[in-house]
């Protein structure tokens, strides 16, 4: 196998000469996994037409093979799609019209790792579960500590080595004079007061606390630090926290803080994007003029007063990610004018002020704005928040949560409840994003997109929603036994251990507004759509790559009685409605019988793909899971019930189903 990161089709080896003006440094390789590695080098010189990296399983790769560009003189590229336990050769190169200059050959070996298809023995189960409450959990892996971390609103955070045993902590704030600053002091004075535009330094000093206070004289910062997202910036070699400083009347901003350790302390660097300059001269206190140029007055498209929410975003709920070419992006927004996307500058972690966005559309139908970037979902004050984007198995998946975040049960307030995760996907990081019915994530007018009155065509795959009476856990007493509802504001991680984890907060049927974090494994079905395991993750060993290659549940173990749960749209959250299971039997001859549903089932040979047809065809996966019970701590792994389970999606409707085998 040979490949090359670059952007020229010239096959000439060149070789360079002693008088060459081109120069390349020897690559450094880091963040090596079983399928990827990060390479860095510098390529400079006059007359350069392209630069990049060549890599191969053979020595001294050249540019005569597949190429992907290295963008800047200081190049950082993530090599993906590598084979596990394989030695690769990599060279940096620079090319002009007359020559190609190569660096020395460097080798690295991908890990044999747990992302291969080897079988693992499950060593822990539900006894390892330790619950935490983190609202709006955003998950990230820190290889230096071998921990997963989740960061949420109001400074809630937790860590775990296994996605089950969570330990809470608080990351401190830093200022110039303190490593444990208070909330009211932490966001007033940015460390960065000049930003780059057109190669020049431009003054910008933004007081995030003062901006959000404009929306309400009684403003309390303690209640308005929302939904952070944390990522390690490879260029900066810093942990970067993107934090929403929310304010009333859209006076919000997303700011970036940095730390040397993932646990902090985090210091405020600068704002990334700001909302709420809907009238007067308030825009003078933002970076609007840095982005679009000097203005005699506020441009009319922003001068909309209380109409802001139909057109433009509330700048909260950031999701920051690297695409497969190494470019840094941020999606953001909540209800209001939808979800938007900006390109970030990896050198600074802030918005890339040199990327221009040409105004597209007019009025409330603006889809590209010179300041806010590109709209990818929502709009017209349709519900939707908590965008999260992750690249999984060839697609960028966009998660959003529709509806109101509360537990529901208030017929007089339709927006109280109905929180539900929806899924879209795209082959490009900035869209277009569509659901399994090919419906676009963007709206062209106001529609109601959640609850019993939903009239938007049931947009977005309903990966799962409120449910009760499910499994052993939900047959006893206590709030957990009452069932989950209002699940959402999730994150998702395609982890280095070969599993993909969906992390979300949930409320419960009989616990008011109390909430906890839950984690489910997620798989791709045969059509490449995501389906979630029916029970939370409790140490199961099945890996994402095994689904297409191995039958994880033997055919003779599948037949039997099953509980079937259908996650349909339009549950009446005002009445705290939940999906409840019914009973079916998967017969050994491939038929399904039951009082409500009958049909057929089949497993694709040599895989874990299952097809369930109960009048409508669902495509999913069949795995084995461990059923939780209420008294987990008093048991060991061998005491728990392991049973065949399926999770499947009907692409034509976006409805998902779950099932598990049970004994009377």
Name these PLM-found stretches.
Residues 112-664:
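Carbohydrate-active catalytic/glycan-binding domains of CAZyme proteins
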Residues 2-3:
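C-terminal motif of bacterial Sec signal peptides marking the signal peptidase cleavage site
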Residues 8-114:
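Short, surface-exposed linear motifs at loops/turns and structural transition points
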């Amino acid at each position: 196998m040979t490949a090359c990161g670059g952007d020229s089709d010239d096959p000439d080896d060149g070789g360079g000469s002693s008088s060459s003006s081109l120069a390349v440094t020897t690559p450094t390789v880091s963040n090596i996994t079983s399928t990827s590695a990060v390479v860095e080098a510098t390529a400079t010189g006059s007359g350069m037409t392209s630069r990049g990296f060549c890599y191969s399983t053979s020595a001294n790769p050249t540019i005569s093979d597949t190429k992907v560009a290295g963008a800047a003189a200081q190049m950082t590229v993530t090599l993906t799609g590598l084979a596990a336990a394989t030695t690769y050769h990599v060279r940096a190169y620079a090319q002009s019209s007359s020559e190609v200059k190569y660096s020395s050959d460097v080798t690295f070996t991908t890990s044999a790792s747990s992302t291969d298809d080897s079988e693992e023995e499950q060593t822990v189960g539900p006894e390892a579960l330790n619950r935490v409450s983190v609202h709006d959990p955003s998950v990230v892996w820190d290889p230096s500590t071998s921990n997963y971390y989740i960061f949420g609103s109001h400074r809630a955070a937790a860590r775990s080595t296994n996605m089950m045993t969570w330990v809470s902590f608080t990351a401190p704030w830093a200022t110039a004079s303190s490593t444990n600053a208070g909330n009211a002091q932490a966001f007033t004075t940015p460390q960065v007061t000049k930003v780059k535009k057109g190669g020049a330094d431009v003054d910008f000093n933004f007081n995030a606390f003062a901006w959000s206070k404009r929306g309400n004289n009684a403003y309390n910062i303690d209640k308005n630090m929302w939904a952070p997202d944390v990522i390690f910036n490879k260029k900066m070699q810093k942990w970067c926290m993107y934090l929403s400083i929310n304010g009333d009347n859209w006076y919000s901003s997303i700011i970036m803080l940095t730390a040397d350790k993932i646990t902090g302390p985090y210091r405020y660097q600068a704002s990334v994007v700001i909302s709420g300059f809907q009238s007067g001269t308030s825009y003078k206190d933002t970076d609007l003029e840095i982005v679009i140029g000097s203005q005699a007055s506020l441009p009319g498209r922003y001068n909309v007063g209380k109409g802001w929410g139909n057109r433009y975003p509330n700048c909260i709920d950031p999701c920051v990610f690297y695409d497969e070419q190494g470019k840094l992006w941020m999606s953001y927004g909540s209800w209001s004018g939808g979800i938007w996307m900006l390109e970030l500058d990896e050198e600074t972690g802030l918005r890339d002020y040199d990327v221009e966005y040409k105004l597209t559309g007019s009025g409330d139908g603006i889809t590209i704005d010179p300041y806010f970037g590109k709209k990818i979902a929502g709009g017209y004050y349709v519900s939707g928040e908590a965008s999260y984007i992750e690249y999984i198995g060839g697609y960028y998946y966009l998660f959003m949560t529709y509806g109101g975040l509360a537990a529901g049960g208030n017929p007089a307030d339709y927006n109280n409840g109905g929180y539900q995760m929806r899924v879209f996907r795209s082959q490009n990081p900035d869209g277009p994003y569509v659901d399994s019915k090919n419906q676009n994530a963007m709206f062209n007018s106001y529609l109601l997109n959640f609850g019993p009155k939903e009239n938007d065509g049931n947009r977005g795959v309903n990966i799962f929603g409120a449910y009760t009476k499910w499994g052993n856990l939900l047959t006893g007493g206590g709030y957990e036994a009452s069932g989950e509802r209002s699940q959402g504001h999730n994150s998702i991680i395609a982890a280095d251990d070969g599993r993909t984890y969906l992390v979300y907060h949930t409320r419960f049927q009989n616990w008011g507004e109390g909430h906890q974090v839950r984690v489910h494994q997620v798989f791709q079905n045969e059509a490449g759509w995501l389906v979630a395991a029916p029970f939370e993750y409790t140490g199961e060993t099945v890996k994402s790559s095994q689904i297409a290659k191995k039958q994880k549940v033997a055919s003779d173990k599948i037949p039997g009685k099953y509980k079937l749960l259908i996650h349909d749209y339009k549950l009446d959250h005002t009445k705290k409605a939940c999906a409840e299971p019914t009973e079916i039997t998967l017969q050994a001859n491939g038929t399904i019988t039951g009082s409500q549903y009958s049909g057929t089932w089949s497993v694709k040979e040599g895989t874990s793909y299952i097809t369930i047809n109960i009048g409508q065809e669902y495509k999913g996966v069949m795995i084995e899971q461990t059923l939780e019970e209420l008294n987990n701590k008093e048991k060991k792994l061998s005491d728990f019930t392991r049973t065949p389970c399926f999770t499947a999606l009907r692409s034509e409707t976006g409805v998902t189903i779950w099932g598990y085998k049970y004994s009377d």
